[in-house]
């Protein structure tokens, strides 16, 4: 795996075009800039057209056709934050509220994309997935 920062769709296309020349790579992990943020389908289409397995930091890319994502489960984290804020509003002193690190990660896998790339997904990986997009 090789991490790649992408600021826009042009960077994404260029990274995917250049990657084969850099030697064997099993997959690319993308950290996408804000200019790409809402272009989920366009990013997933470019990644799929490259035939390179890709992993994203946001589930929306997987729902749009990307292969996989692994990230903090923000819904769960927001709930935990609300519990801590509630304690503050009820008068508990901030120093008495234990600090909580985020612990719940979410792994999402797109089987349709895996099939399109000709990837065999091991059963153990399917069992580890928190969500599978068919």
Name these PLM-found stretches:
Residues 1-134:
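Short hydrophobic alpha-helices and adjacent helix-cap/hinge residues
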